[in-house]
């Protein structure tokens, strides 16, 4: 299979590209800096500006599957007005460019996997949220809705579209999770805020394998929550980390301190969703890491 990956140099994209190559697929990565991209042997890099099909759109006609992972890191800095605009624009512009390239192609890919976020649902308290739950009304939910809409038009062209609403993707050295682990490494771990907020998560391996599963399964279309079947509260997360790492769990971090330091960005850790992967499990996907404890043991090896 010939796969085009946009955003294939980030930590999720890099893992996906390695898995695709390991399965023997032909992979091309769209990147702003093709000359500097560090890619596995046999992976082709193609330049793009993440805003238009110019210079690369013809590659669509050589592609069986497209995966769009492009989006500026939510945790890469304080959510100033300028940064929020970059977060939104990076997602929507890339999605529209891919959609335009597919629309212009004489031969189109069979499937497009469009990345999104579990923030689509807003902040739902203790209510379970699955793929049928409505969108929230906060800023991040609105961005997620627009992100998903950016490639919706390909469905009218007969392209099977899968939307992956990612929870926080866990990796021991990359992404946001090393920051979660840091207080425990320093022996000052404790609950954040009330500790009752939900922490939706998925192990990196499952995020990658679920993507491959949906690409290959021709019955898969529509929205899928990329979240483990065992969502945990912040308090349970902290206690599990402390137990696995054999660290104390005594030092609470008040919500007001998080809000003072991080501003609106603090909502990523002070609020959350009790998300479950209903459609993914109904389709038959079996999680490699269904529980937080099992995931932590693997990540901290």
Task: List each model region and its residues.
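N-terminal Rossmann NAD(P)H-binding glycine-rich loop of SDR-like oxidoreductase domains
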Residues: 3-23
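NAD(P)H-binding glycine-rich loop region in Rossmannoid oxidoreductase-like domains
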Residues: 35-39, 43-94
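Conserved Rossmann-fold NAD(P)-dependent oxidoreductase catalytic core, especially the SDR/UDP-sugar
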Residues: 84-86, 96-138
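Conserved beta-loop-beta element that borders a ligand/cofactor-binding pocket
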Residues: 116, 149-172
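Glycine-rich "substrate-gating" loop/helix at the edge of Rossmann-like oxidoreductase active sites
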Residues: 135-140, 166-174, 194-204, 215
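Alpha-helical substrate-binding/gating segment
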Residues: 181-189, 197-231
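Mid/C-terminal beta-alpha module of Rossmann-like enzyme folds, strongest
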Residues: 217-264, 297-300
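C-terminal amphipathic/interface module of NAD(P)-dependent oxidoreductases
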Residues: 267-301
């Amino acid at each position: 299979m010939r796969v085009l990956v946009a955003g294939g140099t980030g930590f999720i994209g890099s893992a996906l590209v390695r898995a695709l190559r390991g399965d023997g697929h032909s992979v091309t990565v769209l990147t702003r800096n093709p000359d500097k991209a560090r890619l596995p042997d046999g992976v082709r890099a193609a330049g793009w500006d993440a805003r238009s099909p110019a210079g690369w759109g013809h590659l669509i006609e050589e592609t069986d599957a497209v995966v769009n992972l492009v989006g500026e890191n939510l945790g890469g800095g304080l959510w100033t007005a300028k940064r929020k605009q970059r977060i939104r624009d990076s997602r929507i512009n890339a999605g529209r460019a891919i959609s335009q390239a597919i629309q212009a192609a004489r031969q189109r890919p069979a499937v497009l996997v469009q990345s999104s976020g579990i923030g689509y649902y807003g902040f739902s308290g203790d209510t379970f949220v699955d793929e049928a739950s409505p969108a929230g009304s906060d800023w991040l939910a609105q961005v997620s809705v627009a992100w998903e809409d950016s490639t919706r038009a390909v469905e009218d062209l007969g392209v099977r579209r899968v939307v992956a609403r990612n929870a926080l993707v866990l990796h021991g050295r990359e992404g946001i999770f090393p920051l979660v682990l840091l207080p425990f490494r320093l022996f000052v771990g404790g609950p954040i805020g009330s500790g009752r907020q939900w922490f939706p998560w998925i192990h990196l391996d499952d995020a990658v394998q679920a993507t491959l599963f949906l690409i290959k399964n021709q019955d898969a279309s529509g929205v899928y929550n990329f979240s483990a079947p065992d969502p945990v509260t912040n308090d349970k997360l902290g206690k599990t980390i402390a137990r696995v790492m054999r660290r104390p769990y005594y030092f609470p971090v008040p919500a007001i301190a998080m809000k003072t330091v991080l501003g609106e960005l603090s909502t990523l850790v002070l609020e959350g969703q009790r998300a479950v992967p209903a459609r993914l499990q109904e389709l038959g996907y079996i999680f490699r890491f269904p529980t937080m404890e099992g995931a932590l043991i693997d990540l901290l090896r």
